[in-house]
């Protein structure tokens, strides 16, 4: 039972870590574009969305190798627990 709770806890932790970078990048881009729009009094609504989309896409592209390694390691751990009869 404790192994199942451990795996559930680790899965939630991985979800938190995986979502941290894209959300953080979108937040930083949104704040900086919002500040730039405030200073220049530009009222374009689609500008932050497009730039955030590009930023998050680039971050996911750059981090996809690391995401794959961590997720594969987690899956191996789960398969080992299933094989051992938990």
Curated annotation (Swiss-Prot):
Bilayer-spanning residue ranges: 11-31, 54-74
Keyword Transferase: no
Membrane topology note: Multi-pass membrane protein
Record bears the keyword Transmembrane helix: yes
Keywords assigned: Cell membrane, Membrane, Plasmid, Transmembrane, Transmembrane helix, Virulence
One GO term describing the cellular component: plasma membrane
Chief place where the protein resides: membrane
Gene Ontology annotations of biological process type: protein secretion
Function: Required for surface presentation of invasion plasmid antigens. Could play a role in preserving the translocation competence of the Ipa antigens. Required for invasion and for secretion of the three Ipa proteins.
Family under the similarity heading: Belongs to the FliQ/MopD/SpaQ family.
Name of this protein: Surface presentation of antigens protein SpaQ
Organism: Shigella flexneri
Lineage of the species this protein comes from: Bacteria, Pseudomonadati, Pseudomonadota, Gammaproteobacteria, Enterobacterales
